Structure formats: structure tokens, C-alpha cells
Amino acid sequence: MYLNTLSPNSKSHKKSKRVGRGIGSGFGKTSGRGHKGQKSRSGCKIRRGFEGGQMPLYRRIPKFGFVSLKKEKVAEVRLEDLKNFSNCIINLQFLKKTGLIKKNIKYVKIISSGSIITNILIIRNLFVSKSVRNIIESSGGKIEENN
């Protein structure tokens, strides 16, 4: 195989159909747009959800609820991600420094991923699931909570 012998597969570059070029082309006169109507005119852009003047579905359905702008995001960290660290104090700053969570996160919960770890961890001021609490305390680690 040489560079000068390379060529695209046949029919891989389909030529666009030229419209408005006579009756024999099959796309002459109206250019495949049919006769009259809004869609046959130039510059036809009908917005999404437009139902021809009928009250659209998204306005017929009642509104409910809202999205709170004050909501604090709680990031989840799997216990399996912490198995590389041993005898470490794991807190919010440590997780940000190691890149396990983003810098704008304020709350973290450590969840179980099914695997059992054997290294000793000290978890400080983080939310922890019940199964993770059991795993860490059985492996000799500690969970220190806010006072």
C-alpha cells in the first residue's frame, strides 16, 4: 500500500442532489418542496414544539416544582478509590488535593463499592454509609465526625 494508491471507497462521498434543474431531474420546478404552504417558502424555520397555532403540549401541561439554586452538591467517592492510601487522614482537602473530587464540592459521602479494603484509614468530617462504616472499623480505621 502506497500513499499514491489510496482512494476513498466507491460511493463513500455521495454527491448532493441538485434541485430546480428541470422536469427530467425529478426535482425540478418545486424542488421537492411540494406546492404552497409554509414549508415550501424560503426561510422556513418552524420552532420546536410549534403545533400550528394550537396551544402546544408544553404549555397545556401544568407546571410544578422548581430547581433550588442554593442546593449543595454532595459528591460520592467509592471506598475502592481509597484503597491506595493507608494510614492517611482522609478529609475534604485531601480528596481535592488527590483529584478524587472537584474543587467546588463542599460535601462528600463515601459509599461502598462491594470490595473489602484492609488498609487503615482515618476519615474526618465526611459522610459515610453504614456498610463503609462497618468495613473501616473492622479493618482498624476510625471515623471522626464533626462536634
UniProtKB/Swiss-Prot annotation:
**Polar residues bias locations:** 1-10
Q: Which Gene3D superfamilies match?
A: 3.100.10.10
Q: Mind telling me what this protein is named? A: Large ribosomal subunit protein uL15
Its gene is: rplO
Q: Which GO terms describe its molecular function?
A: rRNA binding; structural constituent of ribosome
Q: How does it assemble?
A: Part of the 50S ribosomal subunit.
Q: Which organism is it from?
A: Buchnera aphidicola subsp. Baizongia pistaciae (strain Bp)
Residue numbers spanned by region Disordered: 1-48
Which PANTHER family does the entry link to? 50S RIBOSOMAL PROTEIN L15 (PTHR12934), LARGE RIBOSOMAL SUBUNIT PROTEIN UL15M (PTHR12934:SF11)
Top-level taxon of the source organism: Bacteria
